[in-house]
Amino acid sequence: MLSPERLALPDYEYLAQRHVLTYMEDAVCQLLENKEDISQYGIARFFTEYFNSVCQGTHILFREFSFIQATPHNRASFLRAFWRCFRTVGKNGDLLTMREYHCLLQLLCPDFPLELTQKAARIVLMDDAMDCLMSFSDFLFAFQIQFYYSEFLESVAAIYQDLLSGKNPNTVIVPTSSSGQHRQRPALGDAGMLDGVEASLFCQRLENLCDRHKYSCPPPALVKEILSNVQRLTFYGFLVALSKHHGINQALGALPDKGDLMHDPAMDEELERLLVQVPGLVNSITATSEASCLPSRTPPRVGSPWKPLHRSRKLDAESDGSTEETDESET
């Protein structure tokens, strides 16, 4: 059955809204790169499996960053995959540094940019040093806002800086993150950080921003709700409010509520099924957990039940680059 939303839109608008052309181009590229393997079971089956993986959100696993950020669905799928793969960090009560969270992100996306992880950590840490420890839930919800709304936040940072310096509000802001490189956020002075800007004026500028641009923005009504509760606010105060807002998390739809963050019955059942298939593994894990008094800083590496549709032949080269960056971060 076609949804009412689908029937209400012309075909070309629906295809553009759902980024169908992006997925068709990616599917054809994968088909050409793996044509020898795919020829064994047919092109029709390949396209069926590809678009099933898109619907399930597993198509972004181990892919390059440019693809992961290409569509809102890809971004939401990556957020959901990161949560499901590493929620044991939160269940164990582990606290990790920004660099350690970045290493986890690189396990799913080898070329994930460090700058984006740093920006997410700054929302949590504020004025604290970047090597401070963070809980999984704090980092995850901050990362969700920074990653999903990255272009919006770049423009918001420029608007905030303009308000601090009293510049003309008619300045047009053009995001440039399509290449995967993010413009450095303007340095905010100490006075600006303490005093912030007038919330009502900031709200007007953000309403105009959402009307002008077509990239992903938080629901304007919820942004207005946040800003209506204060007279003045700082840039990072605004980001913290976004990351903790229940309605914005629901509107984005990638993560559960904070109270349900550690519960994923479907994944638990799948992991139990996989563990049972490995002789002696369950007993070994049980014995290890009983012998240990403190939770490990490093979560156990349990094989993900997800499998990429077709492992790219470039994965080894990408992984080598990821290892080098990880080694540098540890030195």
UniProtKB/Swiss-Prot annotation:
Function field: Regulator of the tubulin polyglutamylase complex (TPGC) that controls cytoskeletal organization, nuclear shape, and cilium disassembly by balancing microtubule and actin assembly. Regulates the assembly and stability of the TPGC and thereby modulates polyglutamylation of the microtubule, which antagonizes MAP4 binding.
Region named Required for interaction with TPGS2: 112-331
Region (Required for interaction with TPGS1, LRRC49, and TTLL1): 1-225
BP-aspect Gene Ontology terms: regulation of protein complex stability
Subunit structure, as described in the record: Interacts with PCM1. Interacts with TTLL1, TPGS1, TPGS2 and LRRC49; the interactions link CSTPP1 to the complex TPGC. Binds to alpha-tubulin.
Acidic residues compositional bias, start-end: 318-331
Protein name (Swiss-Prot/TrEMBL): Centriolar satellite-associated tubulin polyglutamylase complex regulator 1
Superkingdom of this protein's organism: Eukaryota
Stretch list, region Disordered: 292-331
Keywords: Cytoplasm, Cytoskeleton, Microtubule, Phosphoprotein
Signal peptide residues on this chain, from the entry's feature table: none
The gene coding this protein: Cstpp1
The keyword Phosphoprotein belongs to this UniProt entry's keyword annotation: yes
Localisation per UniProt entry: Cytoplasm, Cytoskeleton, Microtubule organizing center, Centrosome, Centriolar satellite; Cytoplasm, Cytoskeleton
Region (Required for interaction with PCM1): 1-111
